[in-house]
A protein has these predicted regions:
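Short, low-complexity disordered leader/linker segments with a strong preference
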Residues: 1-44, 69, 73
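Extracytoplasmic "Venus flytrap"
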Residues: 33, 39-64, 79-89, 183, ...
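Hydrophobic alpha-helical segments within soluble ligand-binding/sensing domains
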Residues: 37-38, 133-175, 274-295
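An alpha-beta-alpha
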Residues: 45-47, 63, 151-198, 299-316
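Short beta-strand elements in bilobed, periplasmic/extracellular small-molecule ligand-binding domains
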Residues: 64, 69-90, 149, 195-213
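Beta-alpha junction/loop-to-helix N-cap segments that form part of ligand/metal-binding clefts
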Residues: 79-141, 235-259
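Pocket-lining segment of extracytoplasmic ligand-binding domains
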Residues: 185-254, 260
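Hinge/cleft segment of the Venus flytrap/periplasmic-binding protein
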Residues: 289-332
Length: 332
C-alpha cells in the first residue's frame, strides 16, 4: 500500500520531552522469558506516548510488561518518551528513535502514529490506542491491514452499541451533545458514526468541539446546558481534562456516556470500553513476534480487544441513573 508521506518533518527546537520509566509491575504470568532469543541479544525499542492519562499509561505498561515477559527484561531496552500532550513533540521523539536505529517503534495514540509514519519506512512501527487506522493515516483503501512497516492494535469499541447505551440509560433522551477535540481525527470519526446512528432514531445531535485543552471548560459548559446527555468518544484531550468536565456536568446534572473507561471514571455514567492494559499487552506480543522474526509486519492485520459494559456507580447514584442488567461497576 502506497503511503502519502509528509514533506514537512522539521524538528522543533527547545521542546521538552518527558521520559517515563516504567517497571514490570502488573505483569501477566511469565513463561521462561527469553524463548527464541540469543543469549547476548538486546533489542532496542522506542515508545512515543502522546500524553499521560490512565488509558495511554495502561497501554504502555501492558506493552512493556509483554516484552519483558516474552523476551526477558535482559533482552530488551525500552525507551519510553511522553510528548506531554503536544502532538508536534511526537516528531522529534520518533526522529530520535530513527537516528538511534531502534529495532521497533511503538506509537501510543494517533499523533504518535502519524509522526512515526512520516519518519521511517524501514523500522517496524506498531500503533496502539488508535481508533481507526485508515482515518489516522489517510488511507482510502484501508481494509484491516496497513501494510509496509506498520501494524498495531485499535481501541475501537462498537460505536452503535455505545450509542444504544445512551438510550438504555436515559430512555427519555431527546438531545445529545457530542463533545470532542476537533484536532483529533479519530474523535471526528467516532462522533460522525454515533451522530448518524442516533439521528436515524430521531435524536437531535449537536456537535460541541474544542480545539485544545484551553477550550474544554467553556465548550463543556455550553454542551451541558443544551443537552440531555453528552457523548464523549475516545479522545485524548478530553481524557486529560476529566476533572474539569466532571465538575461541570455534575453541576448541570447532565450525564455523560464515554468512549473509554478512563473518561467514564472521571466524568461519565457508563462506557463500552476495552482494557487498555490488555490492548498494550497484545501490542507487545505482536512486537515480540516481529523482533524474533516470527511475523512479517506488512502482513499483520490490525488487532482489536473485547469491550465490556461498565458504569460509574458514584456518578449514576448522584444523577439518579438506574443501571440496567449487564453492566459491571468500575473498580476504584
Amino acid at each position: 500500500m502506497k503511503k502519502k508521506r509528509s514533506l514537512c518533518a522539521a524538528l522543533l527546537a527547545g521542546l521538552i520531552v518527558t521520559a517515563v520509566c516504567l517497571t514490570g509491575c502488573g505483569q501477566k504470568a511469565a513463561g521462561n522469558g527469553s524463548s527464541g532469543v540469543d543469549s547476548d541479544k538486546v533489542y532496542q525499542v522506542g515508545v512515543c506516548q502522546l500524553t499521560q492519562h490512565d488509558a495511554l499509561d495502561a497501554a504502555t505498561q501492558g506493552f512493556v510488561d509483554a516484552l519483558n515477559t516474552i523476551l526477558g527484561s535482559e533482552h530488551v531496552n525500552i525507551d519510553v518518551q511522553v510528548a506531554s500532550g503536544d502532538s508536534t513533540t511526537c516528531t522529534p521523539i520518533v526522529n530520535s528513535f530513527v537516528n538511534k536505529k531502534v529495532d521497533l517503534i511503538m506509537a501510543n495514540a494517533t499523533p504518535a502514529l502519524q509522526a512515526a509514519y512520516n519518519a521511517t519506512t524501514s523500522i517496524p512501527i506498531l500503533g496502539t490506542s488508535v481508533t481507526e487506522y485508515g482515518v489516522a493515516l489517510g488511507l482510502s483503501d484501508f481494509s484491516g491491514t496497513v501494510g509496509g512497516n506498520i501494524s498495531g492494535t485499535s481501541d475501537l469499541a462498537p460505536l452503535t452499541e455505545q450509542a444504544d447505551m445512551i438510550l438504555d440509560l436515559v430512555p427519555q433522551v431527546k438531545t445529545v451533545g457530542l463533545l470532542y477535540c476537533s484536532a483529533e481525527p479519530n474523535s471526528e470519526y467516532q462522533v460522525k458514526v454515533v451522530e448518524d446512528y442516533l439521528s436515524n432514531k430521531g435524536i437531535t445531535c449537536t456537535r460541541y468541539s474544542f480545539s485544545d485543552s484551553n477550550d474544554v471548560a467553556a465548550v463543556t459548559t455550553k454542551a451541558a446546558a443544551d443537552s440531555d446527555v453528552i457523548y464523549i468518544p475516545t479522545d485524548n484531550t478530553a481524557a486529560s481534562r476529566t476533572e474539569t468536565i466532571g465538575s461541570i456536568v455534575r453541576s448541570a446534572k447532565t450525564p455523560v456516556v464515554a468512549g473509554e473507561q478512563g473518561i467514564c471514571a472521571g466524568c461519565g455514567i457508563a462506557t463500552l470500553s476495552i482494557s487498555y492494559y490488555d490492548l498494550g499487552y497484545k501490542t507487545g506480543e505482536m512486537a515480540a513476534q516481529i523482533l524474533k522474526g516470527e511475523a512479517d509486519i506488512s502482513q499483520m492485520p490490525i488487532e482489536y480487544a473485547n469491550a465490556s459494559k461498565l458504569y460509574n456507580a458514584d456518578m449514576c447514584q448522584e444523577l439518579g441513573i438506574t443501571v440496567p442488567e449487564g453492566y459491571t461497576a468500575l473498580e476504584g
